[in-house]
């Protein structure tokens, strides 16, 4: 069974790269019916203190560098340190965002944020060492359920992050057609090395 699953995953990966239109249709017609199970020692913790927020900044620095590497210039990537992101997280926390850390035993290896005011999810990151274990899917599901007052929460995703978009579609999220941000290297002062867009996705179950 595991070999068949692996072969199926490899086939879908080739389709994603060669025929993204077919892959999109497959994702929308094959929802995830069962998420990975939470394991012993794995939990989410609400960020309450400066030490935890510093952990979030470190996770965000690693996550943003990974996501932005294909589209940002090297100078901007080098700026993405924990100290660079900490002020942003601090301001967001003051303005209604709640952040949660994902722990495996006592090690923080992922994070996600939710904003109850506007029904938005953001800053979904998993460390490189913890990727491929289903943590991202579990955290997104956790975050959505933290917003019961919003039937259709939203989030932003880079158009170049096709793997994430595919996963989110299989979890009931859809692109709304709204472009939240555009980054064009032709514009003066931009940090983008190639043109990219942050797209809005909405949960539609």
List each model region and its residues.
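C-terminal "cap" of GNAT-fold acetyltransferases
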Residues: 153-165, 169-174, 178-205
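Conserved beta-strand in the GNAT
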Residues: 101, 106-125
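A short, internal acetyl-CoA/4′-phosphopantetheine-binding micro-motif in the GNAT/acyltransferase core
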Residues: 121-131, 157-158
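Conserved acetyl-CoA pyrophosphate-binding loop and the N-cap/start of the following alpha-helix
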Residues: 130, 134-142
């Amino acid at each position: 069974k595991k070999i068949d699953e692996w072969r199926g995953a490899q086939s879908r990966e080739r389709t994603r790269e060669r025929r993204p239109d077919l892959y999109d249709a497959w994702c929308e017609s094959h929802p995830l019916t069962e998420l990975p199970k939470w394991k012993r020692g794995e939990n989410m913790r609400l960020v309450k203190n400066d030490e935890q927020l510093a952990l979030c900044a470190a996770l965000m620095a690693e996550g943003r560098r990974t996501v932005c590497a294909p589209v940002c210039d090297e100078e901007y990537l080098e700026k993405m340190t924990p100290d660079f992101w900490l002020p942003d997280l601090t301001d967001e926390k003051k303005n209604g965002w709640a952040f949660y850390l994902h722990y495996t035993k006592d090690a923080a290896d992922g994070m996600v944020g939710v904003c109850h005011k506007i029904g938005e999810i953001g800053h979904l990151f998993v460390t490189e060492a913890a990727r491929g274990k289903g943590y991202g899917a579990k955290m997104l599901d956790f975050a959505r359920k933290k917003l019961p007052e919003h039937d259709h929460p939203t989030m932003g995703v880079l158009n170049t992050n096709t793997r994430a978009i595919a996963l989110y579609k299989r979890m009931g999220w859809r692109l709304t057609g709204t472009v939240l941000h555009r980054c064009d290297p032709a514009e003066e002062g931009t940090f983008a090395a190639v043109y990219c867009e942050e797209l809005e996705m909405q949960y539609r179950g």
